[in-house]
Amino acid sequence: MKGLRSNFVHRHQSQMKKIIVTTVFLFQTVLLFAQAQIQTKVYKWGTGKTAMFDGAGAIFSKQVLKGHAIAGGKKLKFNTGVGGDELFFIIKYGPVHVELNGVSHHLDKGSVVFLLPGDDVVFQNKRKDDVEIYEMQMASAQPDLARGKAAGTSFVMDWFDMSFKPHDRGGVRQLFDRKIVMSPRFDIHITTLNPGLSSHPPHTHKTEEIILMIDGEGEMVLGTSKQKIITGDAAWVESNIPHNITNLAKRPAVYFAIQWN
């Protein structure tokens, strides 16, 4: 009888140890894959395995910005699958041949590609030197594929087809303001800011924002700090953080302003 009781206790203890080990492993896995909050700062352009930034915000549970250099004669293909991330691309240095869901496009610097989950896009470099693109990955805890598809299909926007509206500080190209799979609103415009001018006094707004400099040299107010931003760099701005940008160069600065909520 004592032997049976001893065996039972031993088996029970062994099972409890397995449960504890499994629980600890699962907890560590959750911590490993949890996305850290993206910090408000200027992130430098770079290519390779390391992303410019990789984390989460108030809306996106995952937001990653990567730089890709595509060598002459090479191509890159993207398809995250029906349940995968939503992707957004900007041509940093082109031109580059783009095939979106089987339709061909020839896109140069400043052009964009928006890719819904499950669709295909291929970037092909037909030049001898490298071309460069940004890739932004977006995921949400509450994705809505029907919402994204109802707003429209995956698309490209050619820089040379974008409408430019001049104003007293330079001008603006309003690309789109629409619903997407990962967010009820995704808004992008491109600002041209004349030399020596500021975009506006430092201000705040609830929406998070990315300022991505495709041509120029500026200084950004980000909360209590001032940080330099040059061609290729991107600033990620948290909700309600005072910010603005001043053009430090003797030529116009051109940058993307990307917001979502």
Where are these regions (language model features)?
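A short, N-terminal "cap"/entry segment at the start of jelly-roll beta-barrel domains
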Residues: 33-67, 71-78, 109, 128-131, ...
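Ligand-binding loop in jelly-roll beta-barrel domains
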Residues: 118-142, 239-261
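Positively charged n-region of N-terminal signal peptides that target proteins for export
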Residues: 2, 16-19
